[in-house]
Amino acid sequence: MRFIFLIFLIFPYASVIAEENNYGPVKEKINQSKINWLLDRHNLQEARGGTTSGLEPNIDTEPSDYFLKIIDSNSKKEKDRFAILAMSGDHKANFEFTEIFGSNPNYELDNPYKSWGTETIIVIQNSENFISLQHILVMFMKDNDGNIQGPYVQKHWRQDWSYEDKNILEFQGKNKWAVKKQKNIKKSWSQAVYQVDDSPRYESYGTWVHEEGVSRWVSESTNRPLPRREHSVRNDYDLMKGVNKISVLPWGWVMEENNDKIKTPNKYVGTEYGLARYQKVKNYDFNAAHEYWNSTKDYWNTVRDKWDKTLSSNTKFCLKKLHDNNPLFIFHFSQAEEFKKDKDILAAKNNIDRTIKKFISYECNIR
């Protein structure tokens, strides 16, 4: 049986991301005025994304300890915290993104995107008003002879949750970022999403609502740069404006995205709907993820510290996409591998400072 998963060029116990064309080419667009069903159109249009034969994990349908704590707690804030912590643990993650309509009557809908991976989500910070969750992919794959290869490890994205966050980092388009003051933050939590290299991606805030069987969080509308699956194949827009809805359930959690595609400054192009489903799994070997994290976490802690200082002392900045024809993550992943060998935190800090300095500008006059 074939499965679709999130393609990365990954090596055992290493972290190097895929070339962008591995996200799949645009193959056949469809005129939206000529079809009846938008979300389920596999009979009309092939999905893009990487494909391989993988080791299917066992789905765990039992509620997690944190989900049970949501039920048992009488404190609203504690319920919020347990809902966030319930996103941690071992999961099979399925990602689906589908364009559903465009502004032009004859807008050609892009190929749907589908991928999957197995990833563990580690709680790396946990205090009363702040929780940080690090996602790490671990894949076992079947070769042409049916033999299992792996594990293949990839440091993935990170999400930070802050209670009553007064400062929200907002993407402005054109590689620009700005810190915005927020006023109506009572009992709210912000979710800040970071790239695989711990550089910022987007941030928004919302309020958790707890009901029998589910805890939900819905964000305010959020500007964000194009994800890799899009900027490698699209040049007709340069900003997403999205709303996220997170549902924490007994068997895992789901993040829905409703994303408008914008050509800055204000031209609307189209809208996509996205669904990331995280199902809890059991009896799957994630030891390689924990080994990688334990051997590199001091390096990544230093990267986060550098970004924390940058964001706390600057209200605006810009990020270059490339330096010496390489993106930021290439430098960081290479340096993390060096740190695994020599454990020289001072050298790592100097490398991190120099590297981020090459990519960041406070004058915002970069392309």
Where are the regions a protein language model picked out?
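Sec-dependent N-terminal signal peptides
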Residues: 3-12
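Short hydrophobic/aromatic-rich beta-strand segments that constitute the beta-sheet cores
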Residues: 93-95, 132-135, 191, 196, ...
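Hydrophobic/aromatic beta-strand elements that line small-molecule binding cavities or substrate pockets
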Residues: 109-111, 115-125, 134, 241-248, ...
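A short, structured loop/turn motif at beta-sheet edges
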Residues: 85-90, 123-129, 246-253, 280-284
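Extended serine/threonine-enriched, polar tracts that run as long, contiguous segments within proteins
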Residues: 218-270
